């Protein structure tokens, strides 16, 4: 008897075809089209405190942030925009709510883009023509940022709550107003705190327009909860080819948002991988403290800028096999560790020397890879 498993002749594409979107430029960062998915964050400082804001932007830039947003709730904040936009190493987006006058202030200040929330700016529809002319004159894009928590009351009355359809209709309606003034330098976000609603809304948008999409789960929560929500939502959409720029919203320092966002892109193969640790959950077979060993190796290799794969294994079940598949690895057991380099055992060391030995070997391999012209960027570590 012949059993057919229905396996494809060739591996399926890991991700869906990238959605075609028009490309805009936020400062020197292209968004949409064939441009890589970019990572954004938002300052938590008072925008009026120029020095504090610029210091935080410098930290975000160092962590890999490509575009930063700042809040503009007051005239003092609006007055600070010019200095911030001029001195920031990355493009600055002004985040505007309630007061349309700050949209014009942000454009005049030289911000790279402006985010507007049509749900809470009074008489926003009446100002679209002026905003479109000002933005077009300055050559900057507008982000139409719809949020479930501030949805237009007309749409709440129509749909009863912030449904995917309501979020999408709000965004497309505002786009149509800008289009009436021949302005299409637009990107869109439709954020919701529920990842499922958010995913559905972005799918609707992706089918309805070709504007670039900014992905975000609003009010995602503390670091752990927000990371889970954003990872689920972004992973689902990006795997379908939907999404051109992302911001992970966390009740945590903004640098953490950038780290999580970058890691999501790396996990999907949309960025060259950095230090990656894949560790087993540990079990009764483990003959070493996997948790401690993994954390020590991770800390010791943090910041390495070559795509090096390191395996740190806690038992003999998967250990030798995983270690052989890596550039560098250790299979631990019986108080010692076998060190593998390119699949071959090169030495056996006492357990107390495993971390030190791995770091030394990793540095040596990194130097060799750099000398060989390996693209810098991001080591990969496997722990199990």
UniProtKB/Swiss-Prot annotation:
BP term (GO), one: isopentenyl diphosphate biosynthetic process, methylerythritol 4-phosphate pathway
EC code: 1.17.7.3
Top-level taxon in the UniProt lineage: Bacteria
Catalytic activity: (2E)-4-hydroxy-3-methylbut-2-enyl diphosphate + oxidized [flavodoxin] + H2O + 2 H(+) = 2-C-methyl-D-erythritol 2,4-cyclic diphosphate + reduced [flavodoxin]
Gene3D superfamilies referenced in this protein's UniProt entry, alphabetically: Dihydropteroate synthase-like, Sulfite Reductase Hemoprotein, domain 1
Coiled coil stretches, renumbered: none
Entry note: cofactor: Binds 1 [4Fe-4S] cluster.
Summary of the function given for this chain in its UniProt record: Converts 2C-methyl-D-erythritol 2,4-cyclodiphosphate (ME-2,4cPP) into 1-hydroxy-2-methyl-2-(E)-butenyl 4-diphosphate.
Protein name: 4-hydroxy-3-methylbut-2-en-1-yl diphosphate synthase (flavodoxin)
Lineage, uppermost ranks: Bacteria, Bacillati, Actinomycetota, Actinomycetes, Frankiales
Chain's gene name: ispG
């Amino acid at each position: 008897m012949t059993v057919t498993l229905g396996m494809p002749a060739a591996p399926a594409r890991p991700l869906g075809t990238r959605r075609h979107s028009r490309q805009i430029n936020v400062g020197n960062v292209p968004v949409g089209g064939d441009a890589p998915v970019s990572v954004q964050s938002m300052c938590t400082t008072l925008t009026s405190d120029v020095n504090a804001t610029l210091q935080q932007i410098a930290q975000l830039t160092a962590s890999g942030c490509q575009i930063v947003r700042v809040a503009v709730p007051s005239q003092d904040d609006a007055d600070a925009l010019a200095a911030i936009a001029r001195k920031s190493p990355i493009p600055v987006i002004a985040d505007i709510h309630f007061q349309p006058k700050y949209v014009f202030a942000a454009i005049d200040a030289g911000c790279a883009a402006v985010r507007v929330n049509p749900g809470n700016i009074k008489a926003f529809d009446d100002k679209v023509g002026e905003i479109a002319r000002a933005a077009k004159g300055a050559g900057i894009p507008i982000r139409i940022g719809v949020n479930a928590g501030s949805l237009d009351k007309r749409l709440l009355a129509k749909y009863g709550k912030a449904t995917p359809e309501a979020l999408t209709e709000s965004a497309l309606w505002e786009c149509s107003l800008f289009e009436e003034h021949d302005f299409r330098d637009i990107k869109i976000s439709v954020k919701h705190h529920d990842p499922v609603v958010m995913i559905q809304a972005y799918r609707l948008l992706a089918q309805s327009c070709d504007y670039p999409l900014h992905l975000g789960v609003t009010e995602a929560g503390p670091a752990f909860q927000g990371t889970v929500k954003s990872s689920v939502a972004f992973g689902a959409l990006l795997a379908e080819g939907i999404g051109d720029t992302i911001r992970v919203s966390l009740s945590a320092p903004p640098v953490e948002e950038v780290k999580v966002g970058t890691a999501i892109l790396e996990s999907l193969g949309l960025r060259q991988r950095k230090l990656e640790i894949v560790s087993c959950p540990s079990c009764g077979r483990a003959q070493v403290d996997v948790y401690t060993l993994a954390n020590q190796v991770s800390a010791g290799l943090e910041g390495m800028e070559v795509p090096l794969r390191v395996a740190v294994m806690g038992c003999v079940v998967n250990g030798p096999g995983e270690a052989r598949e890596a550039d560098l690895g250790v299979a631990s057991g019986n108080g010692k560790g076998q060190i593998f380099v390119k699949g071959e055992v090169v030495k056996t060391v006492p357990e107390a020397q495993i971390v030190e030995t791995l770091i030394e070997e990793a540095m040596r391999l990194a130097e060799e890879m750099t000398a060989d012209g390996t693209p810098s960027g991001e080591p990969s570590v496997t722990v199990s």
